[in-house]
Amino acid sequence: MSQIKKVVLAYSGGLDTSIIAKWLQEEYQCEVVTFTADIGQGEEVAPARAKAEAMGIKEIYIEDLREEFARDFVFPMMRANAIYEGEYRLGTSIARPLISKRLVEIAQETGADAISHGATGKGNDQVRFELNAYALMPDVKVIAPWREWDLLSREKLMAYAEEHNIAIEKKKGKKSPYSMDANLLHISYEGGIIEDPANEPEEDMWLWSVSPENAPDQPTYIDISYEKGDIVAINGEAMSPATVMEYLNKVGGENGIGRDDIVENRFVGMKARGCYETPAGTIMLKAHRAIESLTLDRNAAHLKDELMPKYAEMIYNGFWFSPEREMLQALIDQSQDYVSGDVRLKLYKGNVIVVGRTSENSLFDEDIATFEDDGGAYNHKDAEGFIKLNALRLRTAAKKRR
């Protein structure tokens, strides 16, 4: 332990990571550098500075990474229509590569020997943080206190905090029984009564959205503009990636959009139940598929759909910086060259309904697709040979097996 002289800690300013900071100082007798990222979690990050200073920490990094998170991580993922196991929109998974990236960069800037995080030994986050870190800094030393210490209960953590004069916030009102994680893309809930998959979540658990039953009785219409697969404007107003997500979270939440209750298969081998609110992500996925339906070639679209589950699994498992994810990303990005245009959506009581889409790159030819007289644009007789050729193997097999 004495070989470690300086550690960069992913620091939220909360009780757990404050305890980790003090534990690192005591157990490793090392200097601690804290890194706090604002990725849209909706909490004030500035108090993290005072808390770190109270523990004698000198090098403190507090950074607003919302635009980088949206632009370089969420938007590329949205081009792929990525969703894990058909339901999970990867809100936590996609945030970890950026945090790992900055941890490694700060370690290199400060000459640190190691990085540290507060992920537990049961979850996926320990894997994500560390795989992403090793991909960027192969020889980095990672300290994961939850895999080393014996502070394995809330009571032991509280006792440690009191013994070492670590401030314990006493929030007014009812304390949430859930473990929560939030960023621009989502907020997640685990623990409490929802550890039992049979229990319906209580309504007051949800923080970002009204229930669909209590959403407005009148629909909200929005127009989303795309350029090469990315949203560039809403209702005619140009917006940055982070601003897009903030707006869609607000309008989506107001209309009861984005609630998911999932039992997912964790990479570490267990099943876990989580509840998620992903208003912006839900709207973005629906709108992106709508503009692709107009502009992507059929076989290109089908190939993307075949590759998407693997791409989503890479992100979920922590392989954002892997060669296979980067290879797939290049293919996905190339597919978006003509994915530009506008999508009109109706938001109503938890539903995202596509009501219109237009594009100068549209592959929809009304002259061919019409049910009216097409003036010879499509020769119906061509279908006969097409059908017979496709039926050839079926007819041959049927004759042989009689």
From Swiss-Prot:
Q: Which PROSITE patterns match?
A: ARGININOSUCCIN_SYN_1, ARGININOSUCCIN_SYN_2
Q: What NCBIfam families does the annotation carry? A: argG, PRK00509.1
The UniProt similarity line reads: Belongs to the argininosuccinate synthase family. Type 1 subfamily.
Return the SUPFAM superfamilies for the record: Adenine nucleotide alpha hydrolases-like, Argininosuccinate synthetase, C-terminal domain
Q: Which organism is it from?
A: Hydrogenovibrio crunogenus (strain DSM 25203 / XCL-2)
- Superkingdom: Bacteria
Tell me the compartments it is located in: Cytoplasm
Instruction: Enumerate the residues binding ATP.
Output: 10-18, 37, 118
Question: Which residues are recorded as binding L-citrulline?
Answer: 88, 93, 124, 128, 179, 188, 264, 276
EC number per UniProt? 6.3.4.5
What does the subunit comment say?
Homotetramer.
Q: Which UniProt keywords apply?
A: Amino-acid biosynthesis, Arginine biosynthesis, ATP-binding, Cytoplasm, Ligase, Nucleotide-binding
Q: Please list every transmembrane segment annotated in the UniProt record, as residue ranges.
A: none
Name it: Argininosuccinate synthase
Sites binding L-aspartate sit at 120, 124-125
Q: Name one GO molecular function term.
A: ATP binding
Q: Which reaction does it catalyse?
A: L-citrulline + L-aspartate + ATP = 2-(N(omega)-L-arginino)succinate + AMP + diphosphate + H(+)
Its annotated pathway reads: Amino-acid biosynthesis; L-arginine biosynthesis; L-arginine from L-ornithine and carbamoyl phosphate: step 2/3
Gene Ontology cellular-component terms listed: cytoplasm
Q: Which InterPro entries match?
A: Arginosuc_syn_C, Arginosuc_syn_N, Arginosuc_synth, Arginosuc_synth_CS, Arginosuc_synth_type_1_subfam, AS_cat/multimer_dom_body, Rossmann-like_a/b/a_fold
Q: Which GO terms describe its biological process?
A: argininosuccinate metabolic process; L-arginine biosynthetic process; urea cycle
